[in-house]
């Protein structure tokens, strides 16, 4: 297949690109990042504009979006976060709609932040949208992709664990014994190994009846307290420092909701269509990611 990936230079996009190329697909990457590090990946084509595309596209992965944690959420930054997702998705959909041949499927980025903080409630794809700013951001991002008139899948992604992503800033903290539980540690984290995220994305690409939202998480969410214990055990480090919730809220303000919010998302629809996880237990996922690094 001929596949376009927007945001292909990011953590998820790079892993997805390698998997697609590995199975023989032609991959076109549209990216704002034109640095040598990003362009060094073995994509079939690198693009800085949709107008450079000169032949029909079979499928699109829309993964564009600025990092939610890289800067404080000022009013200007919030506009950037929305524009990098919603405005760019609207531009993509408008461009695709004008082509003589539309893609067969659009798989658009999303997040379990759609549900917001819902405490102990188990959340499936049928659960209601949350009410905080991040939940509205995700809901509007999905809506921006909704009007192309082709099969559309929303990749409601949980916390992706791999060599990079969430673990990159956490690993040095845990190695220094500073990776203790956040707040009371009782909130839920819905996670997924990077390899399973890629496999699920490909499964949804190839599964012609898959449509609408899918939670891309492991079937076994954990409380953050357990996440911290498993991290410490894998790295052979004590877990003792526990920053209080009030301090995190003071330092991070609205962004603290992404760390302290409880989102117990379950991948009900992936299970219903027969997807199989390689890493369904957090301890196994962390061992696979962290042990090779520790031994190298």
Regions found by a protein language model. Give the residues of each.
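Mid/C-terminal beta-alpha module of Rossmann-like enzyme folds, strongest
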Residues: 2, 207-254, 287-296
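Conserved beta-loop-beta element that borders a ligand/cofactor-binding pocket
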Residues: 110, 143-163
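NAD(P)H-binding glycine-rich loop region in Rossmannoid oxidoreductase-like domains
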Residues: 42-91
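C-terminal amphipathic/interface module of NAD(P)-dependent oxidoreductases
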Residues: 257-296
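Glycine-rich "substrate-gating" loop/helix at the edge of Rossmann-like oxidoreductase active sites
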Residues: 128-132, 156-164, 184-194
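Conserved Rossmann-fold NAD(P)-dependent oxidoreductase catalytic core, especially the SDR/UDP-sugar
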Residues: 90-131
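Alpha-helical substrate-binding/gating segment
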Residues: 171-179, 187-221
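N-terminal Rossmann NAD(P)H-binding glycine-rich loop of SDR-like oxidoreductase domains
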Residues: 3-22
